[in-house]
Structures are given as C-alpha cells and as structure tokens.
Amino acid sequence: MADSGDAGSSGPWWKSLTNSRKKSKEAAVGVPPPAQPAPGEPTPPAPPSPDWTSSSRENQHPNLLGGAGEPPKPDKLYGDKSGSSRRNLKISRSGRFKEKRKVRATLLPEAGRSPEEAGFPGDPHEDKQ
C-alpha cells in the first residue's frame, strides 16, 4: 500500500507537498555571487540590491532586526482602546469592547480614623492646624 502510487515516482508521496519548488525557484531567480577580483585590482562598488534579503539594516523592518539588544515593540495598529491592555477588555454579546473595572473597597487608614485624623507624615493638611 505504501507504493500504491505511480511506480516511476522519484520519492515518497509526501515529497511533493514540501516546499522544494520554492527552493528551486530561489536558486533560479537568485543573484549569482560576485566574482572575487584579483588582489591587485580595485574592487568595483556594489550596486544597491532591491532584494529584501539585503544586509543593510535601514531597509529591514525593525521587528526583523536580530541582535539589536532591545525587544521588538508591537505595532499599535490593532485597536488598543485608550491605553487599555487586552487583558482588561471584555467583549459583550453585541461584539463591542468594554473595559473590565475592578471595584475596590476603600481602605480605612489606622483602623477607622478619617484621613484628617490619621496624621500621615507629609500630609499638607497637617501644617494648617
């Protein structure tokens, strides 16, 4: 059953599914490597390559640069609403985004005393009394 296909095929059935066409296409279209000039001859300047695989850093996308020492920054194009992260957004049944807000209980400083009575250091109301 393994060889139930064409008897004259040049390999396993899954070889046709791999990207071998892409490799042969790149080899045919690729620019031939420049010939090495003799040591006594001056080297001609290389013309700028329009290929996206050029080694100049200014032509590459900033997220594709490797070894820059800084992590790639995500683009802000995907609808970040008012600085909220995706973690804080909820999608309603209608498909709209709503911000999840945590309800916090107010903290009572010093076991029930009001902030004026608490006497915090650096309190601006402390000087007026």
UniProtKB/Swiss-Prot annotation:
**What role does this protein play?**
May have a role in proliferation and/or differentiation.
Native source organism of the sequence: Homo sapiens (Human)
Question: Which protein family is named in the record?
Answer: Belongs to the PRR15 family.
**The protein, known as:** Proline-rich protein 15
Q: Where does this protein have compositionally biased stretches of type Basic residues?
A: 87-104
Which intervals carry biased composition (Pro residues)? 31-50
- What are the protein's UniProt keywords? Developmental protein
Q: Which InterPro entries is this protein grouped with?
A: PRR15
Superkingdom of origin organism: Eukaryota
Region annotation Disordered: where it falls in the sequence: 1-129
Pfam families documented for this protein = ATAD4
